[in-house]
Regions:
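Glycine-enriched, solvent-exposed interface loops adjoining structured elements
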Residues: 1-182
């Protein structure tokens, strides 16, 4: 059950700094306050983390769309990135609305979960990513940044692998070599 300060403190420890308990604590707190939210959101959308993927039947709005689509739907407030819709059809997003010609739409999307629900492997990978971002503004040490870049890439790869274990592998549908054997 991590908090944003736990994650930031892990990142600071990776670059040899002291942990913080608020974003008003010196240079480290200021840097963390400015980089945490965007880094977290970018990292959440870097892959389809299973704990951050949701499915939702969208609420149709009564307003008539002003474009070529027949229907408008309200997007969820925690949306970070759409993945796709069901039925699978052409759609467009403008501001906080999705437009489609279907009268009902289910959206698969990446959302922003609370930090307390992050799995340990994601916390570790996000902390490494933050450490890379913090290295120059806090330590002004290019060697440290390069080391954290390598560490962040390694922990990301491991975290993505662990997260992928939570779903059934996709079956290979097209098998040209088997079809040739007849």
């Amino acid at each position: 059950m991590a908090t944003k300060f736990d994650i930031v403190s892990q990142a600071l420890l990776l670059i040899g700094e002291s942990p913080i308990s608020s974003f008003s604590e010196g240079v480290s707190g200021t840097v963390a306050a400015n980089l945490y939210d965007t880094t977290r959101d970018s990292f959440l959308t870097a892959t389809r983390w299973r704990f951050a993927v949701g499915k939702l039947k969208l609420s149709r709005l009564t307003d008539t769309p002003l474009n070529e689509y027949s229907y408008a739907f309200q997007l969820p407030s925690d949306l970070l990135m759409p993945i796709g819709t069901y039925p699978s059809a052409r759609y467009e997003i403008y501001e906080d609305k999705l437009y489609s010609n279907h009268n009902e739409v289910e959206l698969d999307y990446i959302f922003r979960p609370d930090e307390s629900t992050f799995p340990a492997y994601f916390v570790e990978a996000l902390a490494a990513q933050l450490a890379e971002k913090f290295a120059i503004p806090i330590t002004n040490n290019q060697t440290m940044r390069q080391a954290m870049e390598a560490h962040a890439a390694d922990t990301y790869r491991k975290a993505a692998f662990r997260d992928a274990q939570g779903r059934t592998p996709k079956a290979i549908k097209h098998r040209p070599y088997i079809a040739v054997r007849g």
